[in-house]
Amino acid sequence: TICHTGYRSEDYSDRSFITRMKALGCPDIIFIFGATNDYWAKSPLGEYKYADWSKKDLYSFRPAMAYMLDTMIDYYPNVEIYFLLNDGLGNEITESVRTICKHYQIDCIELKGLDKMSGHPSVKGMKQISEQVKAYMAVHGK
């Protein structure tokens, strides 16, 4: 999960994206493929919040995602950051990702029609992700 709330409302603060985001080494480019487990775990959405986050805020998706992007932009200067948005997520979380990415001017690559097994991309689905990311990058001159 991006936020600290996981499955069965358990505390995932030891393994959430926002806990691990500073452990990526020295990348040239970052693709964040998140929000799926937040959606599946029914993590609370929370309110849009773009500053002054409390620890409690980070247990809800919207403020945690904003905190993550805000922190990563500062922590990884001169690194291209992209968000990969899975298909098949609910409208509220999909719109939340779009809104927060737009706020931070982060490209949101919306994946479509992925082949999946038990909700996870199959080998074919992983190839589709690769193809869609390559196509997005080509169209946007990246």
Where are the language model's segments positioned?
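Conserved SGNH/GDSL esterase-like catalytic core that processes O-acyl groups on lipids
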Residues: 1-55, 120
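Active-site-proximal beta-strand/loop segments in catalytic clefts of secreted hydrolases
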Residues: 2-6, 33-37, 84-88, 110-114, ...
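Extracytoplasmic/secreted proteins, especially bacterial periplasmic and envelope-associated proteins
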Residues: 16, 53-67, 71, 92, ...
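Active-site segments of SGNH/GDSL-like serine hydrolases
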Residues: 33-37, 64-98
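Sec/Tat-exported extracytoplasmic proteins
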Residues: 34, 69-76, 104-105, 133, ...
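Von Willebrand factor A/integrin I-like adhesion domains
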Residues: 97-110, 115
